[in-house]
């Protein structure tokens, strides 16, 4: 059998990595100039998801400490849709498995499946969000930004999805998936996210990008008016990812 000519090649995978995690987070948060926006005594809800984000306990702790330094009263809310068996206790167990507890974080974790309706989508579905987060003085949205396994677009899995599905708890998650089944995630997630941005006191977001080895490649603090633009820019910035339309 005659084989075609072959050449040896070597794959070089770009894998950027944040060297000093806490220092980088502090610098990012300071860049938002939040002094006038964080009032002393303000109750700030910080989202805590269920995905296995590397160093998520350290990331959340640094954000919490930053808020405390500005005399706010932060607390964590599990923001994971229906994960953890769709129960308040189950979601606390999920966070515990990620080393996120009241002891390790130094703040209360208010876990509840109660939601409130803050509006309706253009498809006439209710927009539901965690009641305790909705009643807070400010919300910090924290999530990993990465490609989604079921769809491709400028907004996939990240801050917008955390608001639309994570903060929606079980009931809100169900409503989003109903709409997505008919109209697609590319339309539904950005729309629900924008309604939440318009109706709730979103203080800022923290987008986390991981490299191909699941190490933190980049962390970006994002003002609410820049969620769309920054998330789209960060989506493939971790290295090792190739957009299909670029092949």
Regions found by a protein language model. Name each.
Residues 90-154:
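An acidic, phosphate/nucleotide-engaging active-site surface
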Residues 53-60, 85, 148-151, 162:
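Short glycine/serine/threonine-rich phosphate/pyrophosphate-binding segments
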Residues 1-24:
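N-terminal amphipathic/basic leader segments beginning at the initiator methionine
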Residues 29-45, 68-71, 246:
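Glycine-rich phosphate/diphosphate-binding loops that line cofactor/substrate pockets in enzymes
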Residues 43-52, 75-80:
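Short glycine-rich or small-residue beta-strand-to-loop segments that form or flank ligand, phosphate
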Residues 57, 73-90, 120:
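Active-site histidine-anchored catalytic micro-motif
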